[in-house]
Amino acid sequence: MTTQQTIKVQLIRSPIGCQESHRATVRGLGLRKIRSTSELVDTPEVRGMINKISYLIKVL
């Protein structure tokens, strides 16, 4: 069995006032409220989303 690597991210800043695409990216990562966390599979797509909104989140 292969185990997939995961990345845990936490929303630390509100996406209010940000670009619509950045808000959609936050929702796409499964984050809703401030301090909410989401555990995601480590893929290039997810890393790109994290890089796009790095000023809003923290990688745990």
Curated annotation (Swiss-Prot):
Molecular function (Gene Ontology), one example: structural constituent of ribosome
Keywords: Ribonucleoprotein, Ribosomal protein
The UniProt record lists the keyword ATP-binding: no
Single GO BP term: translation
One Pfam family linked to the record: Ribosomal_L30
Description of how the protein assembles with itself and partners: Part of the 50S ribosomal subunit.
UniProt organism field: Albidiferax ferrireducens (strain ATCC BAA-621 / DSM 15236 / T118) (Rhodoferax ferrireducens)
Gene Ontology CC annotations of this record: cytosolic large ribosomal subunit
Family in the record: Belongs to the universal ribosomal protein uL30 family.
CDD domains associated with the record: Ribosomal_L30
Gene it is expressed from: rpmD
NCBIfam families reported in the protein's UniProt record: rpmD_bact
Name of protein: Large ribosomal subunit protein uL30
